[in-house]
Amino acid sequence: SCKKLPNANEIAWYAEKGDARWDGERIWTTMGHLYKGGMWFKNKAFIKLTESFSESYGPGFYGDMRDNWGMISKSVAQGAPVGFFAERYFFLPALGSYSVGYLYKIGEEGCYWSSSAGNNNSNCGYMLEFNKNTVSVNTTGSDVGYYVMEFE
């Protein structure tokens, strides 16, 4: 179930104001294998120190993304967070995605569902997607295999 996942507005805040940082050296494991690569994001409480983070509306001019379709695509910084504030970030591994029975781009790309359906099509959902260069929020069809994971 996607009920406990962040909604479209929340993933927009992470993408837009979460200081997304690609870490190509962080090691993680899945399905009995070691992999590297993933994204660090500021946690919700840390974003709230400087921004008006809300579950009801997205950052800037986006409004409620569940009602007003919006796409975000943003360049990311490189390297893990360091120093005093590093503990205020969380890590999402680049778990790849499934499509037509195959696993794609594990260690290169992360694709995570939100709890929000697309505003014009209940067969679509909002998702957070990232790679070493960009982080994006968009909608896609529910026939692809993205990950269902609470963020923090």
What does each model-found stretch correspond to?
Residues 2-4, 16:
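An acidic, glycine-rich, mixed-charge low-complexity segment common to nucleic-acid enzymes
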Residues 10, 14-152:
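C-terminal, surface-exposed recognition/capping segments
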